[in-house]
Amino acid sequence: MEKIHVLLVEDEQTLAMIIKDTLEEQDFIITTAGDGEEGLRKFFEQKPDVLVADVMMPRMDGFEMVRRIRQSDKATPVLFLTARSAINDVVKGFELGANDYLKKPFGMQELIVRLKALMHKAFVEKEITNTYTCLLYTSDAAD
């Protein structure tokens, strides 16, 4: 299986480095960004497999960044990783298009498992779409 490319958008540099180092030990490829504006730019430049984003950041928060991403990309899995734990924040995150929401503090093993689950789900969805497309093509060719 190919390595998973994660775009990590986190303004706390120490936490970002800990996450980066831990995920790289698990064979993930990590790109980091320190705020939502940089994250938005890197997302469209690099097309990561999954986006992990804090919510509270300078210049552009994670909610706004994901809202803008979802205008043109609805497929890339998004996991919010944030201290914003109020139910209205969680609901807002999912309404904006997040696939998962992990509250700080969190365990690294939980983050790893959630990322792998998101990628597995994305892979299965892509396979289903490809199979459906092939079936449509086969059906059209038979007519």
List the model feature ranges, each with a label.
Residues 17-25:
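Charged docking surfaces used in two-component/phosphorelay signaling
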Residues 27-34, 42:
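Short hydrophobic/Thr-rich beta-strand motif most characteristic of the beta2 strand and flanking loop
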Residues 46-52:
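Active-site beta3 strand of CheY-like receiver
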Residues 4-5, 117-139:
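Short, Lys/Arg-enriched segments at the junction into DNA-binding effector domains
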Residues 55-57:
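Receiver (REC) domain active-site loop signature in two-component systems and cognate sites
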Residues 10:
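Conserved acidic carboxylate
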Residues 35-38, 61-64:
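Acidic catalytic/metal-coordinating carboxylates
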